[in-house]
């Protein structure tokens, strides 16, 4: 049966995902940045309360995946922290200036991760040659690749995802970006073994007082009175679709 991973941005969302049938959680911060490394406090609270596998993302900033020496040092430190806290896996990825896997740096990440299952995230979708990259990741011992098939969403990239699956058994190819209940059957019919979804929506802040027109970010139009939360019903619906597909 296909595995359902839910992207979560808080301990509460991780619990919601777990309670509604998620098989695994990718734990992130900063949804507007596409997911950054969670704080130590969030990592500890999730580790204490969530019982399904949780894989934190290790990504120090938004943007591309070619990092400075200082950023890479932070990545290694965060990998060690996640390992010490007892998480079963993590999500990360590093490219060089030419869009190839930065093999020396990824080797250091794999060594720091030790027995943890490493997912190479959507840095894969920014790589120059996906099949060569997949071979490099297999050589490194990466467990899985999260990809949209190098398109803006996974449904558009499904043909590339199928090509990657046909390329070999390892790493596992996990489809993500825009995967929802309404299009999930396309991925299941294509033989995708793992799917990744945020399964949520932006929710209004409970604050009654609002200083409108004030932004905490460089985006002057950012809505500071909303937050992204996992929708338990959406998770349960996706899990049900997977179970019914398996029973066919």
From Swiss-Prot:
Main location: cytoplasm
Subcellular location: Cytoplasm
An annotated Gene Ontology molecular function: copper ion binding
A cellular-component GO term for this protein: cytoplasm
Keywords: Cytoplasm
Domain of life: Bacteria
Subunit structure: Homodimer.
Annotated PANTHER family: COPPER HOMEOSTASIS PROTEIN CUTC, COPPER HOMEOSTASIS PROTEIN CUTC HOMOLOG
Name of the featured protein: PF03932 family protein CutC
Organism: Escherichia coli O7:K1 (strain IAI39 / ExPEC)
Originating gene: cutC
């Amino acid at each position: 049966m296909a595995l359902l991973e839910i992207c979560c941005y808080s301990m509460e969302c991780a619990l919601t995902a777990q309670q509604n049938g998620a098989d695994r959680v990718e734990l992130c911060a900063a949804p507007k940045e596409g997911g950054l490394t969670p704080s130590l406090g969030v990592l500890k609270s999730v580790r204490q309360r969530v019982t399904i596998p949780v894989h934190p993302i290790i990504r120090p900033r938004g943007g591309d995946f070619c990092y400075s020496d200082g950023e890479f040092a932070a990545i290694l430190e965060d990998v060690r922290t996640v390992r010490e806290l007892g998480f079963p896996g993590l999500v990360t990825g590093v490219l060089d200036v030419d869009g190839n896997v930065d093999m020396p740096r990824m080797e250091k990440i794999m060594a720091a991760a030790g027995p943890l299952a490493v997912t190479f995230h959507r840095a894969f979708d920014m790589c120059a040659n996906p099949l060569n990259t997949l071979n490099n990741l297999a050589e490194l011992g990466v467990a899985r690749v999260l990809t949209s098939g190098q398109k803006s969403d996974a449904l558009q990239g499904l043909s590339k995802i199928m090509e990657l699956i046909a390329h070999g058994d390892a790493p596992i190819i996990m489809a993500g970006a825009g995967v929802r209940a309404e299009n999930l059957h396309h991925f299941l019919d294509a033989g995708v073994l793992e799917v990744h979804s945020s399964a949520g929506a932006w929710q209004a802040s409970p604050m009654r007082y609002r200083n409108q027109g004030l932004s905490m970010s460089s985006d002057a139009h950012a809505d500071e009175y909303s937050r992204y939360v996992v929708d338990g019903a959406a998770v349960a619906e996706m899990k049900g679709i997977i179970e019914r597909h398996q029973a066919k």
